[in-house]
Amino acid sequence: MSTIPGFNQIQFEGFCRFIDQGLTEELSKFPKIEDTNQEIDFELFLERYQLVEPSIKERDAVYESLTYSSELYVSARLIWKNDRRRYIQEQTILIGKIPLMTSLGAFIVNGIYRIVINQILQSPGIYYQSELNDNGISVYTGTIISDWGGRLELEIDRKTRIWVRVSRQQKLSILVLLSAMGLNIREILENVCYPELFLSFLNDKKQIGSKENAILEFYQQFACVEGDPVFSESLSKDLQKKFFQQRCELGGIGRRNMNRRLNLDIPQNNTFLLPRDILAAADRLIRIKFGMGTLDDMNHLQNKRIRSVADLLQEQFGLALVRLENMARGNIYAALKHNWTPTPQNLVNSTPLTDTYKVFFRLHPLSQVLDRTNPLTQIVHGRKLSYLGPGGLTARTATFPIRDIHPSHYGRICPIDTSEGINVGLIGSLAIHARIGRWGSLESPFYKISERSKGARMLYLSPGRDEYYMVAAGNSLALNQGIQEEQVVPARYRQEFLTIAWEQVHLRSIFSFQYFSIGASLIPFIEHNDANRALMSSNMQRQAVPLSQSEKCIVGTGLEGQAALDSGALAIAEHEGEIIYTDTDKILLSGNGDTLRIPLVMYQRSNKNTCMHQKPQVQRGKCIKKGQILAYGAATVGGELALGKNVLVAYMPWEGYNFEDAVLISERLVYEDIYTSFHIRKYEIQINQGSERVTNEIPHLEVHLLRNLDKNGIVMLGSWVETGDILVGKLTPQMVKESSYAPEDRLLRTILGMRVYTSKETCLKLPIGGRGRVIDVRWVQSSKTDETEKTESIRVYILQKREIKVGDKVAGRHGNKGIISKILPRQDMPYLQDGRPVDMVFNPLGVPSRMNVGQIFESSLGLAGGLLDRHYRIAPFDERYEQEASRKLVFSELYEASKQTVNPWIFEPESPGKSRIFDGRTGDPFEQPVIIGKPYILKLIHQVDDKIHGRSSGRYSRLTQQPLKGRAKKGGQRVGEMEVWALEGFGVAYILQEMLTYKSDHIRARQEVLGTIIFGGRIPTPEDAPESFRLFVRELRSLALELNHFLVSEKTFQLNRKEA
């Protein structure tokens, strides 16, 4: 079996390709710059360029909010010809900084980890399709797609006349295009296979007389010029440049695809569209019209290409060189105008290149902030594939066939792992063994079966090539030829599944996980789950929070070790040697006569506020080897990924508290810190130099709010802070209004011309839900070019310890998610026959309808593993060995556990996997035996502390006088429909009227109500309408509906009664 490639290898290979090839290719395109009088020549030498080692380390770049980059130096030559003398000056110049990729496969820009994800684009070339027009008649078209996405369409009508459309504009004859490209009628007829079909154009009254007329007609259609343009050489050059060179540039990939599809032998370096391409495309279109060719599947991966990090960085580098060229031309012109001596370095500077990459990493849609919720999230984010982005699709216009699974995705793109919602099918994930080939295609490995050699040779195939082979669908993966293979095996051939004899198989899969992404490959018994639930599980594993006491899973798939290793969460020994010192901050390793310092990550905040921390696992004096684990990271145990906990679970209803995916848990999970996690929140405040000052003397604030500030006005390390406490004391000066001057202030202003200033309190306060311990305070100064714009920022990091509580979200690895509804005392929880209370109670109705039966296998096998102290690593699709292999394995382990522990209730033949348990409140057994097990349950990032919100009073919108929206603004909302129903059910009419009217949004009455509640008294009854009703009236008026209203009260309402 082959070794699984590194999970970050795609990113590393892409960046290395950019450094080795991309820089050279773009520098070779840099032109020789001359002025109009040819007095100064400036050029760059691509043979000699160098990247300098960064001046800072990765950790320092994150801590100081800097960019981890390298300076690029290029050799340049300047020739200055003046007064019959020639000055030649060669110099190595700095042209900018290029961000470097870190060991995580990401970049550090302004102290933030960013990742560049891969994009799937339509590959340049020609594609033939058939569509039905309005009359229900098939119309055959051939679409030529350029390297940048422009389109040129060839269309053949019922009379076999061929028309051309440029970017979906009005169509014109193909003869016009060919004549504009320089061919005459005779050359056209001599170089096509069906000249008689082209003769129909010659009988047309609008016959193209000359090349000039063709250029004029094509230019008029292409450039949308009104009137009659006049032919000139400049017009011809303009058309040649804008259309045939810019819009019709195929690129290397497009030229290769055109040659392969049209059977041409045009040289690979000729990347522009030629008349020969148009003629061959027209001939192929005619053949397809008469049924002598095949149409193209636009969604096939052989018609797609991957735009990797190398392509994106190379494109930005080329854009920066164009700006550098313009700068050099401008400086040459300025040197000649102002008569100063230029040098290679003062003709250019590093601003264009540095700013181009800064804008790219901050604003480009494919440059995203690296998700670091847990180690798995970091790896999966770098292996994403996106149809979205510049040149790609949009979520609103993407059709269902594009989002759907295609047979060519087999072994290349995971059929399970994708986004949920509007981006479903547009954001995918690379399969484990997939790699990006030379031409941007996704390649997948296969074993080639040969009768001559006993061994199996592995080869990578691009999409389309594997369709010509009989590929065994993974039923027989053993390489030992002595094993008798099955006589009939399932196989794939030309996107169809067949059943053939083993002797007819050409290729076979190399690994049972070959089809899946990393997230899907970590799901045990995935073959027993519905695909929708497997998709949810793949996404929810990336949302798992690292726990304070991690535990590796009892039932896994075997990829947990490599996932932890490639994530960068572990500290690995790069050299062999002896440990001479270790503590929580660093490890000192002595080897080869040198002492190597290995820093450890200590309470580092991720961008999802989770805590990244490394714990050393080696002692002083221990000798280690290269590659050995020195420290475990967050969510890793024993060198394996550990995202959750193995807890005892019962599948049964319990008083309705686990209705509709609610989860009942034991208080043991709280008191023993089973699901306790640490979270680090960052609070930042900007300080303008000069005007604002940081101090601990803040007027008009209570003393206890300032208790944690030091003499400089900044919160002290180790302080425990609560909601509303001051973290940084800051005063901002503001000028007092003229009307509010005191008499003495007015006298000072009149006599001395002095302005009176006062200070406004603009402190950094701890918001709601932010209580915790201060673990770090940083004072960061941002350097700008303008001295007046220099600002400072103070960042305060607060550590929170969060136990699991009601409202938190938990999930298994099979899409079984739920919200904690109640925390029971452990004595009230259902307990097993040996007296152990269960930790969680799940609803059994959540299993059959969702068809994720894999959780039942995992639960039962986890129970057996917990009793036998064993860990299982099970590859998916184990039914390829025998029928019911998963069930047999689980039952055999349960049977062995019942024998070794002398507990027959663990495996009861009448109801295997089930056991009779007892009610903890009464001690009575439940009526039916239930399934008990030990599944691996995760605590997700969706926590109630981040979401729960309520307000009694707060800000209102000035326009509508309604409460503001959102938790961040301390907003709220009016009483909703369901709340009204609940109050109606209790019959509290007066409370309901108060809440809906003057208590909620009556501008004057709500202040009076608040005063009467505080001081006592009768709540006043307002005499006018509340603001919500007035807002409703204004909304109707905006729709041209006038609504007149008046308020009826006891004073205005009189009723005359007559006795019957």
UniProtKB/Swiss-Prot annotation:
Entries under Pfam families matching the protein: RNA_pol_Rpb2_1, RNA_pol_Rpb2_2, RNA_pol_Rpb2_3, RNA_pol_Rpb2_6, RNA_pol_Rpb2_7
Biological process (GO), any one: DNA-templated transcription
GO molecular function: DNA binding; DNA-directed RNA polymerase activity; ribonucleoside binding
Protein name: DNA-directed RNA polymerase subunit beta
Subunit structure comment from the entry: In plastids the minimal PEP RNA polymerase catalytic core is composed of four subunits: alpha, beta, beta', and beta''. When a (nuclear-encoded) sigma factor is associated with the core the holoenzyme is formed, which can initiate transcription.
Keywords, comma-separated and alphabetical: Chloroplast, DNA-directed RNA polymerase, Nucleotidyltransferase, Plastid, Transcription, Transferase
Catalytic activity: RNA(n) + a ribonucleoside 5'-triphosphate = RNA(n+1) + diphosphate
Subcellular localization: Plastid, Chloroplast
Function: DNA-dependent RNA polymerase catalyzes the transcription of DNA into RNA using the four ribonucleoside triphosphates as substrates.
EC number: 2.7.7.6
UniProt entry tagged with the keyword Cytoplasm: no
Superkingdom of origin organism: Eukaryota
